[in-house]
């Protein structure tokens, strides 16, 4: 539940903000201390890790309680550190081994879940919003139109799932979207989105307060779009199927002219040409 990368970011899922419910679900073990668990982001920020992500498992308690808790947590971080969450994740209770959604009286139906996602997007327009492959292709398509900005493809939930020898029967939960990454990328293009593999902001130190200032003042556009196109081009050259590669090139041709700054636009054209000739890892 907690991932740190080069001491630059921390993503932690709260499970539930209801203290009583949390303690019932975590009766013992290192996660049993509600206060310590809930203040993990504060400790990360105090230690100089200025990029954090929030998440709550919708369905463990009433969605109203969790929704308010999540936004109050974001508001607290912004008030104390002048930096809101870089991402907000919105998983919900889904079927899995020994997990029946009908056993959870607070499980969200699709319509309510869509409203929760839309309201979080309105309340925190600066944040990246994540939905996983627990959701179906149809639901992920609907959520993309409501504010989701980050999705996965080709995910594994089993122990050692990305290795050659997978531990059988170790899946944490069932996937509802089993498409490959290539299929998800091409699907996004068909839906008029620009898939991006960019990590430039992390690598250049554009995190925390610097990142927040840029996204809140719409200063990130001349960076995100060019980097998205160049990283997508690199994916197309190295990994994509023939159809997806063709769709990537068509998308780039359509989008390149919409980069507002002329110098950035020309630089992006140069980077795209360089990628086609074999250069890699180019970004602003």
Residue ranges with predicted function:
Residues 10, 62, 66, 105-108, ...:
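Catalytic cores of large soluble enzymes that bind and process phosphate-bearing ligands
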Residues 15-16, 57-58, 156, 201-202:
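Residue-level "edge-of-site" marker
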Residues 141-149, 155-284:
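Radical SAM enzyme core and accessory elements
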Residues 22-34, 101-109, 169-174:
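Glycine-rich tight-turn/loop motif centered on a GG-T
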Residues 19-22, 96-100, 161-162:
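Short acidic/His/Gly/Ser-rich catalytic and metal-binding motifs that mark active-site loops
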Residues 1-7, 11:
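Single conserved hydrophobic/aromatic residue that forms the stacking wall/gate
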Residues 35-99, 110-138, 145, 150, ...:
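Conserved C-terminal portion of the radical SAM core fold
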Residues 9-30, 41-44:
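Phosphate/diphosphate-binding glycine-rich loops and adjacent basic-rich segments that engage nucleotide
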């Amino acid at each position: 539940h907690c991932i740190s990368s080069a001491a630059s970011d921390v993503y932690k899922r709260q499970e539930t903000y209801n203290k009583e419910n949390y303690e019932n679900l975590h009766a013992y073990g290192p996660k049993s201390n509600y206060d310590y668990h809930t203040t993990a982001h504060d400790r990360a920020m105090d230690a100089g890790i200025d990029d954090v992500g929030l998440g709550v498992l919708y369905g463990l308690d009433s969605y109203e309680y969790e929704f308010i808790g999540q936004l109050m947590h974001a508001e607290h971080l912004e008030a104390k550190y002048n930096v809101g969450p870089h991402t907000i994740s919105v998983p919900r209770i889904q079927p899995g081994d020994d997990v029946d959604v009908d056993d959870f009286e607070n499980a969200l139906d699709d319509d309510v879940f869509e409203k929760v996602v839309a309201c979080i997007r309105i309340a925190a327009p600066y944040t990246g919003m994540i939905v996983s492959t627990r959701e179906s292709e149809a639901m992920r398509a609907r959520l993309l139109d409501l504010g989701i900005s980050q999705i996965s493809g080709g995910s594994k939930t089993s122990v050692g799932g990305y290795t050659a020898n997978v531990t059988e029967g170790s899946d944490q939960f069932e996937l509802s979207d089993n498409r490959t990454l290539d299929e998800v990328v091409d699907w996004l293009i068909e839906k008029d989105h620009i898939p991006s593999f960019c990590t430039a902001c992390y690598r250049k130190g554009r995190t925390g307060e610097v990142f927040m200032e840029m996204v809140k003042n719409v200063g990130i556009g001349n960076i995100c779009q060019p980097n998205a196109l160049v990283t997508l081009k690199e994916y197309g050259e190295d990994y994509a199927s023939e159809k997806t590669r063709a769709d990537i090139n068509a998308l780039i041709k359509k989008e390149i002219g919409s980069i507002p700054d002329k110098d950035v636009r020309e630089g992006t054209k140069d980077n795209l040409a360089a990628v086609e000739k074999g250069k890699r890892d180019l970004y602003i």
